Regions:
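Canonical Rossmann dinucleotide-binding motif of NAD(H)/NADP(H)-dependent dehydrogenases/reductases
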Residues: 6-37
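The beta1-alpha1 cofactor-binding region of Rossmann-like NAD(H)/NADP(H)-dependent oxidoreductases
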Residues: 44-45, 61-71, 103, 215
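Substrate-binding pocket helix/loop in short-chain dehydrogenase/reductase
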Residues: 97-98, 105-107, 202
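C-terminal substrate-recognition "lid" of short-chain dehydrogenase/reductases
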Residues: 118, 133, 210-239, 244
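Active-site helix of classical SDR
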Residues: 121, 157, 165
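Residue(s) in the substrate-gating loop at a strand-loop-helix junction
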Residues: 141
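Short, small/polar-rich loop/turn modules that mediate ligand/substrate recognition or access, typified
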Residues: 173, 178, 232-234
């Protein structure tokens, strides 16, 4: 995928959940646009492959663990000396109807999605404030706005990320930091775990008749990370082919 629009040379971009799918494509986007790109993921084997593919630095970390996150950001600072762009994309699924969701499944999903978004952002804020510049883009979901059967934990986590995005945007604006979110329905491994009949039903309800490609998510994130988007903050951008209309 070529990038003819943005130049992120001299900036460091961190992407979580970056070993595959949307995260990998986002990493590729920033690397091709000249950023010092850091991929963070829990899966070390896939992370090594992804890092080699896009020419980025890979850091294995558990976004649901504060010590692991803080160590990862310290590693980034030791390597590049700055943090400019943070894309919170890490996520997992533990889909069940709510009366079958265990405490463990509930805590795991919220810990990665909402907890990871919080921990990474918190760890980067001191560096954003010192630089008087920063871009945070959180990946939420159509489900966070509208709910979905069998995804009470996921919907709650994604809705929480929307609230976090708007609150962080208000708190960080005076430091030159923007905080936004995208709401995608991308074609990734997480989507492919949905039963085919349910997937076809969802696709039929999308005005554009298909799921997004991860590169389309990356392009939207690239815009929100750019200096051209410097006056946009607290926004939740649907990138879903009109599904949320």
């Amino acid at each position: 995928m070529g990038n003819l629009t943005y130049d992120f040379s001299g900036q460091t971009a961190i992407i979580t959940g970056a070993a595959r799918g949307i995260g990998l494509e986002i990493g590729r986007f920033f690397a091709e646009a000249g950023a010092d790109t850091v991929l963070i993921d829990f899966d070390e084997n896939e992370l090594d492959i992804a890092s080699d593919q896009v020419g980025a630095k890979g850091i294995a970390a558990d976004v649901s663990n504060t010590e692991s996150v803080d160590k990862a950001i310290a590693d980034v600072m030791a390597t590049t000396g700055r943090v400019d762009i943070l894309v919170n994309n890490a996520g997992i699924l533990r889909d069940k109807v709510l009366w079958k969701i265990s405490d463990e499944d509930w805590d795991a999903v919220l810990g990665v999605h909402a907890g990871g978004t919080f921990r990474l952002t918190r760890a980067c804020v001191p560096h954003f404030r010192q630089q008087e510049f920063g871009r945070v883009i959180n990946v939420t979901s159509y489900t966070g706005l509208h709910g979905n059967t069998g995804q009470a934990n996921y919907a709650t986590a994604k809705a929480g990320i929307i609230g976090f995005t708007k609150t962080a945007a208000k708190e960080l604006a005076r430091f030159g930091v923007t905080v936004n979110a995208i709401s995608p329905n991308a074609e990734t491994r997480m989507v492919s775990s949905i039963p085919p009949d349910k997937l076809a039903e969802i696709a039929a309800g999308i005005p554009m008749g298909r799921f997004a490609h991860p590169s389309e998510m990356a392009a939207a994130i690239g815009f929100l990370a750019s200096r051209e988007a410097g006056y946009i903050t607290g926004a939740v951008l649907p990138v879903d082919g009109g599904l949320s209309m």
